[in-house]
Every structure is written in C-alpha cells, then in structure tokens.
Amino acid sequence: KKSDLHTLQTGVVKQDSPIAVIGAGTGLGEGFLIPQGNKYQIFPSEGGHSDFAPRNQLEIELLKYLQHKFQVQHISVERVVSGQGIVSIYQFLRDRKFTTESSEIGEKIRRWEQESEKTIDPASIISQAAFKKSDRLCEQTMKIFVEAYGAEAGNLAIKLLPYGGIYIAGGIAAKILPMMQDGLFIKALKDKGRVGSLLDEIPIHIVLNPQVGLVGSVLYGLQLQN
C-alpha cells in the first residue's frame, strides 16, 4: 500500500526490471527480486558482509579504528550500516575526540559498554538525541551513518540497475525518517562518478510498515496454495 511507503525519489518504473531491497537493523540485509510473469523470484544475498568502502578521510579513519577494535583486516559494511554500526561510529568519534561528548549521553553509553546483559539500546539513544539536535556528537554520528547507508544502497543499485525500485527496509530507516529525507542519503546514493546519472530514474522508497516481513510471508503462503 502507498501508506506503507515514503518515496525519496519517484523515478520512472520500467517493467520487467529488478527490484532491490536493503535494510539496516540488527545487521544489514540485501536482496533482489526478478520479475517472472505475474510474480517475482526472490534472491537473498550476504551483501551486508561485503567490504566497507570509505569515501573520505574521516571514513578512512573510521575503517582503521574498526580494524583495531575488532582486530581484523576485513570490515564489512554491516559493521557500519546497522544498529551496532551507529554505536561504533559514536565510539569512534568519541575516542578520537572529534567533538565533545555530553555527560548525559556519555554516561548512558558507558553504562551500556559495561553491562554484561544489555538493558540499554544505545543506537536509539544516539539517534533520538540527533533527531532532537540536542547533542553534536550524536548528530555527527548519524550524519556518517546516513551517508554510509546511502552509499551502500547506491552500490547495490549500480550492480543491479533496479528500475523496478529500491526499497529501504529494516528497523532503522523509518525511525529516522527526517534524517533520511534531508538529502544526505540520496546524495551519497547517487555519488557514483561517471555513472551516477544512471540512478536518477530509479524509484527509491522507504518501507514504513514494521510488519512487512510478516505480510510478505502471508502473501507467499497464499501463492503456494494457488
């Protein structure tokens, strides 16, 4: 339904074109759909575990920070574009002292870091503070997150050319809708150099319905019955 979506770019739907789905939440899911008659064949992927590709000096520093933090060379894009990624970006900015940490937010994050059984949702705390524009560190955290999210959605789009649409799902996008709307996401998505213009006509939607997975399961079950 139209009420289940928020459109970031109307684009021009081309029949018989793929549809791409990407969704950040606990992790980062990616998949695509290919039309087959009056149905779609669904293909999952593990695209969230592909390499995080930094696009500027700050993101290069973030990559190095995560390599040191996790003691690995390979840093997946999921390490950045996910709920845990939001926290890691915050910790990176805090530890590198890119801007001052507020005592209120800092206390909550440190309490979460010390908990063995996690009772705090730090990503929610950070995103809410950024949404209220009450904390510079949280605002910068979410700026990096949204840009990285957009860049990865653009990577998926360049590979598939999904003129059937890109659907941004997962548990985060709908909750930070104003940040997804302010232009940073789309700008990063379409920043693909010489081929960036290929993305101008791709429809881009944010999925607002948190039960979309359940709805899809029901529809698939009905298709099997028929």
What residue spans do the PLM features occupy?
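Phosphate-binding/catalytic loop of phosphoryl-transfer enzymes
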Residues: 1-94, 217-220, 224-225
